[in-house]
């Protein structure tokens, strides 16, 4: 493979559309790329065609075709390689340089898209490898090659680049390379007259790939970040011996937004929402590797303790607990005590190593199979993980050498192999670390070296990882067509189909049909969503207890004016609650540099407790950008159907330089409907209309979720916040209109209403009728509008808008009103929506796919035309046939003569089916044309073949529903040393904390939740909003296996009081609250507002013990 066997030619004649010709040594003919289509040419046609082309590059191989935009695609050619050794007679080559050749333009592709430079840097970073021979596929381990014929999709990185070739029936094995990412290290060992090889191959999965602080934990499918399968391979003569180990991020929903050197602060998502992902990840391991054991190396410092406790609790709550051994080993702490501590860990792992064994074959005979693997992880799955995997590999190498019978007469072979492997494992750790963190591994041998690498990692993570992450996403997914269309297809179709079939990447028309017809196979599921926004004026009165008995957060969230959210009679609760808070902290210089999260945690806890008055809720996410904070809660019964949660934010203050103004956004998929929530705080001032419009435009443009998703990529969008749009009237005019209830006059002069009508902002968004008084600006703790010297005119600054982008979208506004909470100069606003989502079943989806595939015609769009009675098609007949095709509305993308016939590639399969109507026509009155399809059996070839495991990975199983069916979640203790380390709670919002010892400073009288309104005073002991330690009592009392009820409203029980949690009171007792000052402007009475006391406290009931965990038999071992 040292010779560049690929020659690439280009036709530079501007009179014709761009065209590329590719030739390869050892193959007759060539490939022709033209008009977005690909065709093979025979040798004679190639010789003729080449005369009008110029050679542009010689290459070692082709990775495939990558669509970088909807209108631009590039051919990716490998132009630089390094050989790392030979395995199975094949050269193993490391890619050191690539070149992109535009297929649709004549100029340089770098001028078309600036991302190409970053992508070229990624592909040339020496992390990609390929084999020179088809017979050895690097993506498969030795045992996998014996049991599977196809490549392992997890490690086949350029799989999507093959799709264009597969669409047009090109043999990819002959023309394209298969590359994997990771590390390949090969050494030669001489044993007497025989030569053997020792290799270490680490295959990085592409299913959830990214850089260190961009991608952590698991996604909803159970794929984890930095998942690496490492194969320790010994080859001697015809004998091969293979040992597999795996590593991967902790399979929970968590992230680590580290910006400091050595930072280990962790943000965990809702504990309960991780359960389905955890179950799916372990099911995948069982399906692919058989038995496995988990080795957790997390420590007890900072966020690692939080994450480690959550990991252990999750595993103990899983039905895998009795089947999968969980070995917990604080690597850093134990190794500081003694370097020999690793021996104790090896003793714990030894039974598993002995039981699982390794793969061994002689020639074509399988002597021994590996029956399981050890899964090792630390925080990054880098340094500590590599050390432990090295220990496992070295210990098992002795048995491998013994099986190969290499010690006979050569006493030192075992020692030589161990020395080679020790060196390979060290280099393997460096290479894996470089991919994920940007530097080599920290081995602990040199403090100066480790410190410099930590600093380099920090610079890498904060300055360069964003571009690298974008390059990963572009290389793996491309940008063939409308991202919203593809995103909707991903929500409807089983993931295995999207990953493994070219059809859904290459044929946009078919995907559009699938999305449009998805209601045919969907089961409607109506959910209720409460959306609220409140500018809390910097929390200036957050510690004021004087007025805490006057009003409650429940009057906002559960206001009687919004009885369609909560009704005592039928207990119809919202399924999802989204609450945005603006000016959570003072917008001063220090907070703009690093905003305190104390108020965020306090508000999160108070909203959580308020919700728990009615029913259990799970906190899905909480994110703060200086003063803007967004909270998202969901009922546990819908949690199994939530997926793809992501967070994004953008600063808009001072032209985007500061976060005193800005937006925070969440995205989430409910069943198959994608929903986006955006909380914004726009520019202030009576006349700064243009600035507010620009803030909206900036937010719409710059909010980006993973895989390039935008705000407009979603089915349903809720936009809430303090938009600061004013009313173009004087203060007296506004107040008089409020007194008279003349809101129509105010609406006519409302800036947001006017700007929407002009198409300057919130185009396409809807808003409920403004039938309540302006929400700004009030004197605090008063019903008086601003009486200060500035005397600002009242305005509807606080708004909630929405947009449903589905063709038959059914999002219904049930209520839109304000609440009378007076601790801020703004009044909170709330809205209740009924959103129709769709639950899609995998088996029904297969039926729809088959129907669409058949109706859309062959994806290659190719017809073969011949003249009856003539052995060769006469070229002069092409123009009249071209005219006939135009009459049908078909566009010719490419044509060629092949074996005497005319081959024509049309713009779609539907046009190919339409062209069959020309069969039997007579051209010129005498010549009869025959028309047939190149691929008449396309429907059978594209028929989806989904295993039960594929469908289980797509659908929510009864087991996963049961995992989230409990009404009492695990209870955690909180520690003040974790301030700012974590930001969201993992508790379900019901039940009570078990009695446990507390320090004297933290003890106080217990009060009921009903009397606890929003935060009124900073507690003596700050509680973080994520778990730090799981109490043993919580594990004993947590009920994880209760069945999840259907989404129908639960039956009412008016005789039963709402559940309440008994909490320690962090507030001091105070005198009775004084009456509020009189109102100078009589406001319309709040519809059905209630200011009475909350429901009475009920006795605390202990959760029942969990039922016996079901013992699930292991799946068939499938390596």
Curated annotation (Swiss-Prot):
The keyword Hydrolase appears for this protein: yes
Enzyme class: hydrolase
Catalyzed reactions per annotation: a 1,2-diacyl-sn-glycero-3-phospho-(1D-myo-inositol-4,5-bisphosphate) + H2O = a 1,2-diacyl-sn-glycero-3-phospho-(1D-myo-inositol 4-phosphate) + phosphate
Phenotype on disruption: Viable but small with slow grow and uncoordinated movements. Synaptic vesicles at neuromuscular synapses are reduced, arranged linearly and are dissociated from the synaptic active zone. Several defects in vesicle recycling including accumulation of endocytic pits at the neuromuscular junctions and accumulation of coated vesicles predominantly at synapses of neurons but also near the Golgi in cell bodies of neurons, muscles, hypodermis and gonadal sheath cells.
Listed Low complexity bias regions: 1050-1072
Superkingdom, taxonomy of origin: Eukaryota
Extent of Pro residues compositional bias: 1073-1085, 1093-1119
Gene3D superfamilies: 3.30.70.330, Endonuclease/exonuclease/phosphatase
Family: Belongs to the synaptojanin family. In the central section; belongs to the inositol 1,4,5-trisphosphate 5-phosphatase family.
Domain characteristics, as noted in the entry: The Pro-rich domain is dispensable for endocytosis during the synaptic vesicle recycling, locomotion and for endogenous and evoked excitatory postsynaptic currents (EPSC) at neuromuscular junctions. May play a role together with the SAC domain in targeting unc-26 to synapses.
Protein's recorded name: Synaptojanin
Annotated organism of origin: Caenorhabditis elegans
Gene that encodes the chain: unc-26
């Amino acid at each position: 493979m040292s010779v560049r066997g690929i020659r690439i030619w280009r036709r530079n004649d501007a009179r014709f559309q761009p065209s590329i010709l590719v030739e390869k040594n050892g193959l007759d003919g060539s490939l022709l790329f033209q008009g977005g289509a690909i065709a093979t040419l025979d040798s004679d046609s190639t010789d003729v065609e080449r005369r009008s082309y110029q050679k542009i590059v010689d290459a070692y191989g082709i990775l495939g075709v990558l669509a970088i935009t909807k209108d631009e695609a590039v051919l990716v050619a490998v132009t630089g390689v390094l050989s790392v050794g030979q395995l199975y007679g094949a050269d193993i080559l490391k890619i050191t340089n690539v070149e992109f050749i535009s297929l649709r333009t004549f100029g340089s592709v770098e001028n078309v898209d600036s991302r190409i430079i970053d992508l070229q840097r990624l592909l040339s970073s020496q992390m990609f490898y390929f084999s020179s021979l088809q017979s050895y596929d690097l993506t498969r381990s030795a045992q996998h090659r014996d049991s599977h014929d196809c490549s392992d999709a997890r490690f086949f990185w350029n799989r999507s680049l093959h799709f264009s070739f597969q669409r047009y029936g090109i043999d990819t094995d002959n023309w394209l390379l298969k590359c994997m990412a990771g590390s390949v290290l090969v050494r030669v060992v001489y044993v007497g007259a025989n030569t053997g090889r020792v290799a270490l191959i680490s295959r990085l999965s592409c299913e959830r790939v990214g850089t260190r602080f961009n991608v952590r934990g698991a996604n909803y499918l159970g794929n984890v970040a930095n998942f690496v399968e490492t194969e320790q391979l010994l080859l001697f003569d015809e004998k091969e011996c293979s040992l597999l180990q795996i590593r991967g991020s902790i399979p929970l929903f968590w992230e680590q937004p580290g910006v400091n050197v050595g930072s280990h602060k962790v943000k965990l998502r809702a504990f309960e929402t991780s359960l389905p992902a955890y179950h799916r990840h372990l099911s995948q391991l069982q399906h692919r590797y058989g038995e496995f054991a988990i080795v957790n190396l997390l420590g007890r410092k900072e966020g690692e303790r939080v994450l480690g406790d959550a990991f252990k609790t999750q595993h103990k709550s899983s039905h895998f607990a009795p089947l999968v051994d969980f070995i917990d080993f604080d690597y850093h702490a134990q190794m500081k005590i003694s370097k020999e501590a690793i021996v104790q860990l090896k003793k714990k792992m030894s039974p598993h190593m002995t039981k699982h064994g390794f793969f061994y074959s002689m020639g074509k005979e399988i002597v021994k199979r590996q029956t399981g693997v050890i899964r090792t992880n630390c925080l990054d799955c880098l340094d500590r993980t590599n050390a432990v995997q090295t220990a496992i590999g070295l210990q098992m190498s002795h048995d491998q050498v013994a099986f190969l019978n290499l010690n006979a007469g050569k006493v030192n072979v075992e020692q030589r192999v161990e020395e080679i492997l020790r060196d390979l494992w060290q280099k393997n750790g460096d290479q894996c670390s470089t991919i994920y963190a940007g530097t080599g591994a920290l081995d602990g041998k040199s403090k100066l070296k480790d410190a410099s690498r930590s600093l380099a990692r920090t610079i890498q993570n904060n300055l360069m990882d964003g571009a690298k992450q974008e390059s990963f996403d572009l290389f793996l997914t491309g940008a063939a067509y409308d991202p919203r269309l593809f995103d909707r297809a991903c929500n409807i179709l089983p993931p295995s189909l999207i990953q493994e079939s070219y059809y859904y990447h290459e044929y946009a028309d078919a995907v559009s049909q699938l999305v449009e017809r998805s209601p045919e196979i969907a089961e409607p599921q109506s959910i209720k969503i409460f959306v609220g926004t409140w500018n809390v004026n910097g929390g200036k009165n957050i510690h004021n207890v004087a007025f805490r008995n006057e009003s409650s957060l429940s009057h906002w969230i559960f206001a009687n004016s919004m009885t369609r959210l909560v009704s005592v009679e039928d207990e119809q609760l919202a399924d999802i609650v989204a609450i945005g808070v603006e000016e959570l902290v003072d917008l001063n210089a220090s907070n703009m540099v690093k905003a305190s999260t104390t108020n965020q945690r306090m508000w999160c806890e108070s909203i959580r407790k308020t919700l728990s008055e009615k029913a259990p809720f799970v906190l899905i996410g909480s994110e703060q950008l200086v003063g803007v904070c967004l909270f998202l809660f969901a009922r546990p019964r819908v949690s199994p159907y939530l997926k793809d949660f992501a967070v994004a934010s953008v600063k808009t203050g001072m032209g985007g330089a500061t976060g005193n103004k800005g937006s925070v956004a969440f995205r989430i998929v409910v069943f198959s409907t994608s929903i986006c929530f955006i909380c914004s705080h726009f520019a202030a001032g009576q006349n700064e209309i243009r600035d507010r419009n620009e803030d909206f435009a900036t937010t719409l443009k710059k909010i980006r979720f993973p895989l390039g998703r935008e705000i407009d990529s979603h089915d349903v969008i809720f936009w809430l916040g303090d938009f600061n749009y004013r009313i173009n009237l004087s203060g007296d005019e506004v107040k008089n209109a409020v007194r008279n209830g003349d809101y129509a006059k105010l609406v006519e002069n409302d800036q947001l209403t006017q700007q929407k009508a002009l198409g300057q902002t919130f185009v396409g968004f809807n808003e409920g009728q403004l039938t309540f008084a302006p929400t700004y600006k009030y004197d605090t703790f008063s019903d008086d509008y601003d009486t200060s010297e500035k005397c600002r005119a009242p305005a509807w600054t606080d708004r909630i808008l929405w947009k449903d982008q589905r063709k038959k979208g059914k999002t219904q506004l049930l209520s839109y009103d304000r609440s009378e909470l007076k601790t801020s100069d703004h009044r909170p606003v709330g809205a209740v929506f009924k959103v129709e989502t769709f639950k899609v079943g995998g088996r029904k989806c297969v039926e729809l796919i088959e129907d669409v595939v058949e109706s859309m015609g062959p994806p290659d769009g190719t017809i073969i035309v011949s003249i009856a009675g003539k052995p060769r098609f006469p070229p002069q007949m092409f123009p009249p046939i071209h005219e006939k095709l135009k009459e049908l509305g078909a566009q010719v993308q490419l044509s060629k003569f092949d074996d005497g016939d005319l081959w024509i590639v049309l713009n779609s399969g539907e046009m190919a089916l339409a062209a069959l109507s020309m069969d039997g026509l007579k051209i010129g009155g005498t010549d009869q044309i025959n028309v047939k399809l190149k691929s008449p059996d396309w429907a059978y070839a594209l028929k989806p073949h989904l295993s039960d495991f594929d469908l289980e990975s797509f659908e929510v199983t009864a087991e996963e529903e049961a995992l989230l069916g409990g009404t009492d979640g695990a209870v955690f203790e909180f520690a003040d040393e974790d301030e700012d380390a974590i930001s969201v709670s993992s508790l379900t919002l019901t039940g009570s904390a078990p009695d446990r010892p507390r320090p004297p400073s933290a003890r106080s009288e217990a009060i009921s939740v009903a009397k606890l309104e929003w935060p009124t005073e900073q507690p003596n002991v700050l509680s973080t909003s994520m778990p730090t330690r799981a109490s043993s009592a919580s594990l004993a009392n947590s009920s994880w296996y209760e069945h999840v009820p259907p989404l129908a409203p639960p039956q009412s029980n008016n005789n039963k009081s709402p559940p309440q949690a008994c909490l320690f009171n962090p507030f001091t007792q105070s005198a009775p609250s004084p009456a509020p000052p009189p109102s100078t402007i009589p406001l319309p009475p709040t519809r059905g507002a209630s200011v009475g006391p909350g429901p009475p406290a009920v006795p605390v009931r202990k959760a029942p013990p969990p039922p016996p965990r079901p013992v699930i038999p292991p799946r068939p071992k499938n390596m």
